[in-house]
Amino acid sequence: MNLNFMPLLHAYNHASIDFHFNSSARDFCVHEVPLYEFSNTGEHAVIQVRKSGLSTLEMLQIFSQILGVRIAELGYAGLKDKNALTTQFISLPKKYAPLLEKNTSNFQEKNLKILSLNYHHNKIKLGHLKGNRFFMRFKKMTPLNAQKTEQVLEQIARFGMPNYFGPQRFGKFNDNHQEGLKILQNQTKFAHQKLNAFLISSYQSYLFNALLSKRLEISKIISAFSVKENLEFFKQKNLNINPNTLKALKNQAHPFKILEGDVMRHYPYGKFFDALELEKESERFLKKEAAPTGLLDGKKALYAKNLSLEIEKEFQHNLLSSHAKTLGSRRFFWVFAENVTSQYVKEKAQFELGFYLPKGSYASALLKEIKHEKGENNDEF
């Protein structure tokens, strides 16, 4: 497989929308929504921190330096953007809590502010978040493009959007996935085990994005062409499908087609199950009750069946499925933005957008779907 980045298909068919977005503390805000309420009792202090111009790991280093706490003692649910104004929760042993207020000015000098202090009985771990609320400000937006953006947002609100991994996953030079494959091939290895695991996960992410784009291509072809033309397309791809199934797929109202053998999952949390009745599952998908999932290949990954598996095979890798420390999983192909709000400020030619996404989903995927930049690649911003 070609490991260079290829343009990823969009869900919707509008023309490119021209505007400027700068990922900065003024124009991009991220607010973490915790997975559970904190009990206000326990051996761990939980603080809500606002930061700007800092990565999460840089923030943890500052806390370690100022408070004398070991980084291993600090807990956090996820990594937040450096070029944004972000709030997130971190935990630390209760004994360090009295030092927080004493060092307020020291934190402020580092672009950190503690917004709240609570307590809980366990340390915050990776994944202990429900999702994130986002705010984005688009500039140099004409009234016509603002109207087009609203129309796209209506489609996203109704049908959702592709759940692509964002460019952060692939590094500054878009080569994390290539390094991950080299690790699997025993061509390179780093001393830090977490770095090795992250780079391998970047390769998984690359394959997932490519599979999702391929599925979008197939969905668009099913919608755009006749049953006869589709049969010829599937024949050329050595994929078996009968005319009645194609007719049923064309009748699915959602732009992303549920295929025979897809692994579905109750949305946004729940068990995996096979898509047996395509019409029924497509209706549930349209109602946002369940959604199809894509492969993150690994030793214990759950694979699709039938037609879905035939397509998925191209994006499997035996080095992933045999790698002892890469267990694998599945990820929603599709995600639904919630609480979408928008406002066009005509006198400033600015468009303000707010929305919520569940954990693991990227604001960059929504921006990509709106903008439809020509010649677009994963490193668009």
UniProtKB/Swiss-Prot annotation:
The keyword tRNA processing applies. GO terms for molecular function: RNA binding; tRNA pseudouridine(13) synthase activity. Keywords: Isomerase, tRNA processing. Its EC number is 5.4.99.27. It catalyses: uridine(13) in tRNA = pseudouridine(13) in tRNA. GO terms for biological process: tRNA pseudouridine synthesis. It holds the Pfam family TruD. PROSITE patterns: TRUD, UPF0024. The active site is at D81 (nucleophile). It comes from the Bacteria. It is an enzyme of class 5 (isomerase). GO terms for cellular component: cytosol. Residues 160-335 form the TRUD domain. The keyword Isomerase applies. Responsible for synthesis of pseudouridine from uracil-13 in transfer RNAs. Belongs to the pseudouridine synthase TruD family. This is tRNA pseudouridine synthase D. It comes from Helicobacter pylori (strain Shi470). The lineage of its organism: Bacteria, Pseudomonadati, Campylobacterota, Epsilonproteobacteria, Campylobacterales. The gene is truD.
